[in-house]
Amino acid sequence: MSRLATKSLKGLRLRPSLPSTSPASPWLAATRLRRYASNEHKGNFKGQMVQSITQRLEREKADLERLGNLGEKKAVGINWSITASKSPFPPPSLPSSPSPAPSDPPPVVLMFGGMTYFLGTTRPHDPDPSSTLPLSATVPPRHKTGKASLEAAWADFVDIVGEANVSTLPDNLHAHSTSEWSSHPADPSQRPFCVVYPSTTDEVSLIMKVCHARRIPVVGYSGGTSLEGHFTPTRGGISIDFAHMNQIVALHKEDLDVVVQPAVGWESLNEELAEHNLFFPPDPGPGAMIGGMVGTGCSGTNAYRYGTMREWVLSLTVVLADGTVIKTRQRPRKSSAGYDLTKLFIGSEGTLGLVTEATLKVTVKPASSSVAVASFGSIREAADCVARVVGDGVPVAAVEILDDDQMRFINAAGATTRQWKEAPTIFFKFSGTAAGVKEQVALVRGLAKANGGLSFDFARSEDEMTELWSARKEALWSTMAVKKPGEHVWTGDVAVPMSRLPDIIEETKRDLKSSGLTSSIVGHVGDGNFHIILVYSDKERVLAEDCVHRMVKRAIEMEGTVTVCFLR
């Protein structure tokens, strides 16, 4: 018996069984097995423990012996050709004959053994884990967008939502294919055949079942404020517009969460939450709705302190491609049960399913808040100031940058109530207690001055705060206002590690200036993110493409990422 078994038995104050060589050993073992397996002693814990340990050790010993025998067999199989001449059982010699002298193995045996060894060492033992199927060889999705198929589907949609909620008007189809700032509007052949307006999750499910059965592609649509072509169709099919699904389903104030439908705008949601001293932090562009915000995993000016959309979604109700309805999880904040399906759907842009309901986290509004604006002599100085604020751990709520061209566009558009210094400008937002906000403002003022700040203004009232922050929210629309008829707007979204932010902003600004295109830089630089906005004519299309291509390359070289609608 092994030492472990003996030690275990001693711990139980039982005498170990006799060795297996003892004549009494089989009888004792059988007696003990019968004793502890009987109903009379079924509850005897010590007996069950002895039996369990003994059986386990016997199984382990048998496994080790079997493994050892298997290893010996493999070794003999591999080396048989080399050791064949040294058999441990040579044929006995005749008494009258002298013992034969040892001789070298035959050449054929040596040759065969060498070939076996060579093949055994060169042949891979495990399959190559890498994919051997090139992307070009994969089978693309096959859709049926012929006239007969789409017209038959139209009749099915009318049965589901009513004829008034299925539109084939050309203007409506165009609006669901492109936007004023889309750099790649859909070709007429790629526009949706119709736009369907469901009102419930069940209707969305029925619509998707029809499309799945008829192999019709689908694009979801909510606010239509995307800047990088997220809702632009490429295969025709249909567009599902969630305009009728715009209700706040339930507010759980005590739990700090709210259940909403996809066409609820973040601005209208915050108006409702403000009545309860609550707010929903993600704040992308004006007009954005929850469905699109989930689909794109949006950011916003509050992302520096509060994070992006990913941090504020608890659960989703999703309709899959075949019409199956799933709920990704329940409402509790903490859950480690199963896969994190919620995060999987956030940022998937409708490619995995259509969101018909979202449970969002909300938080209590800060007791105090303020806004400050600092201007600088160069874009590099402004970016360096941001890096210092972040590096020093100043707990500001938001950090936004607008370059000199963007400030000039805002003045020209007259979208705000004041004239701004046309210089690279940083907009800071502060929140917390009154004392905390005051301390943050003082720290940022000092850092701005140390990094070449030309001016520093901060809001002393709610009206001043609204006025100062209005310039940031009007950035895109101000640029749209300066473009001439026939010109287009192209936007790009770049993010890099914070340590590379000053470099990429400076190099991008220099490149934009040298291109001669009307352009600006604006963004949520607190987390290393900024946008470029290009205005170009049809003649300048190639020039704009080259500029965007260099920006993409620059971001990748700096270990960053880019979201841009870019086709070569």
Locations of the language-model features?
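C-terminal substrate-recognition/cap domain of FAD-linked oxidoreductases
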Residues: 98-102, 170-177, 364, 370, ...
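Short acidic/histidine-rich active-site segments
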Residues: 524, 560-568
